[in-house]
Structure formats: C-alpha cells, structure tokens
C-alpha cells in the first residue's frame, strides 16, 4: 500500500502479509501458528511545523498546509520486520487450562531524519536537528500460563499464574 504524506515530497509505503493457521485436534486443544512479514520502505515524515504560521497567525505569513521541514535528499526510513510464533492452549477439564505463547521477531531499520527544534524569536527562522539510526534486532518471548476456574459457595474465581521470558539482542 502506498500513499502521499501530509507534507510535500513525503510518501508512506507498506507491504504486510500475516497469515495464520489454527489446528484443533480436539475440543479441548488448539494450536495457532502466526507469521508476519512487514516491509516499510517509506514512512512519511516525522517532522512538525511551528504553531505560529500554521495553527496560529504569524505576522510574517502563514505556512502552506503541506509545508515540509525536512531534507528530501538525506531523509530515509526503511524497515523490515519478520515474525513467527504460536499460541497453544489445552484444557484438562472444566477447571484447569494451560497456555503457552511464543514469538520470534527480527527487525531491520535504517532511519535518517531532519526535524525542527524551535522557531527563533524573529518568527521566521526554524532551527533544525538530525537523527540517524541503523538498527538490527532479534527477540523472542515465551509466555506460560496455568489457569484454574472454580467456585466457593456463590463466588466464582479465576486463578491465573505464569512465567514469562523475553530476550532481545540488538
């Protein structure tokens, strides 16, 4: 999917595919396999415009609604994410249920941007700064749960306990 951004020369583009498959070998057991591929070669602009000249009047004039404060020759946003995982659930009976969820994620992002810092006192000079980030991350998480549903007299209870583990390498 591709679209023009709010500001001049900015565009957003995304490709996303996220198929999943659920298998239920019995009425008490299910396994869902999840996958995800996302590619964002463009992501619009993260810049901003000063309030004077856009939301509020500036005695020196108004900014165009599509004013762009960046640098089209330097800015870049390029991200790829790949993920896979599963959700497993098994009910032993009407009281006890166990679950395990797992996810693996890889992200690759290259980001360069120019952004405004402040409008100077002359109401016409916009200070700017830049940011650059080149990151590669890999992470995985596993979530284990045990659940008990029961009653004591007129009160219904749901007891949930679990253990999570998450690791991130960047």
Task: Give residue ranges: language-model regions.
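Face-selective signature of the C-terminal outer-membrane beta-barrel domain
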Residues: 82-107, 130-170
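Transmembrane beta-strands of outer-membrane beta-barrel pores
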Residues: 1-4, 15, 37-41, 104-110, ...
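Short acidic, gly/pro-rich beta-turn/loop elements at beta-sheet edges
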Residues: 6, 43-45, 110-112, 154-156, ...
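Acidic/polar loop-and-plug regions of large Gram-negative outer-membrane beta-barrel proteins
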Residues: 18-24, 28-91, 106-137
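Outer-membrane beta-barrel translocator/receptor signature
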Residues: 1-17, 25-29
